[in-house]
Amino acid sequence: EKVKLIAKDLGFDDCRFTKAKEATHAQEFQKWLNEDKNGDMEWMENNPERRKDPRLLVEGASTVIVLALNYFPTEKVDLNKSGVGRFAKYAWGNDYHNVIDKKLKNFAKALEELGGEQRFYVDYGPILERDFATDAGVGWNGKSTVQIHPKLGTWFFLAELVTTLNLNPDQPMPNRCGTCTKCIDCCPTDAITAPNKMDPRRCISYFTIEHKGSIPLEFRESIGDRVFGCDECLEVCPWNRFAKASKEAKFATREFVGMPLIQFLGLNESGFRSLFRRSPVKRLGRERFLRNVCIAIGNSGKEKDIPHLRKVIAEESEMIKEHAKWAIDAIKSRSSLVHN
């Protein structure tokens, strides 16, 4: 209970324990890698054995402490306005890696005083976190593969500490999805290929965040007005009716949420870095962000936006030019259908 009180004092919304052991889906993860389903996410191939078993991360590891931190925005933003791009809600505030990292450093110091040795991770480390979150009873894996919390819904981050402290494990939580298939049915690109099966190479979040090159033509229209991530399978989850706004001030909605897409096209490198300072969007880089913006304008823009896209074609990199040309063609095609 003392450890859980420390977590609560640091602002975490849940804290639970499970035994350090091989991850439940370790073999499935290896098969997934063997089938190249990680796409451009080469980092997932690093240290696969360590990802499967936290005991390889900390000598004498006994417990995995799993933490949940709510990020559901307090502000309501009208994203249905014409000409506005969509960001995944997790990116509305400051970069969660930095926010959670500071909390975990303080948590680790407190555990040291209790005699523990530990390492901590915020999704960048080698650990199959959803397996341990399920085992610890934080929530369960939905059919979209997203972890669902009974009080936070789908709007929370996971973090873990692997420790030598021997803590009594919590009970796993049963899967409560029942017959619901809303997340599967709503996916714009059919990336959820079956219950609990996700092909990231079809996922809009993958294309707009992880994919490094040109976005395949077959997926561009489905991306719609999304410029960073996709929340479709999260939004429809019925468990979100219990979700409450995050109390973490650093997750407050930033000024770029709700900005017109055309304004993004005018950002130079320094403007991009300034606007997205301390945001996860900054890690995407200006070139890939403008690639996404061009697609969003192509899907939602009007003829008045074409001169802005032509300016991009005259001044920007080959990848951005190619997506801007596609956007102009998409707008013209849509406009001709309206006029006819």
What are these regions (language model features)?
Residues 273-275, 302-313, 334-340:
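Amphipathic alpha-helical scaffolding segments comprising HEAT/armadillo-like alpha-solenoid repeats
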Residues 271, 275-300:
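Loop/turn-rich, solvent-exposed surfaces of beta-rich toroidal or solenoidal domains
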Residues 264-268, 275-280, 308-316:
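Alpha-solenoid HEAT/Armadillo-like helical repeat scaffolds in large eukaryotic proteins
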Residues 1-176, 224:
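Auxiliary alpha/beta "docking" domains used to position bulky ligands
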Residues 286, 316-318:
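Short inter-helical turns and helix N-cap capping residues of alpha-solenoid HEAT/ARM repeat scaffolds
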Residues 206-224, 235-267:
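A beta-strand-loop signature enriched in Asp, Gly, Thr, and Trp
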Residues 12, 182-206, 226-250, 308:
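Iron-sulfur cluster-binding cysteine motifs and their immediate structural context
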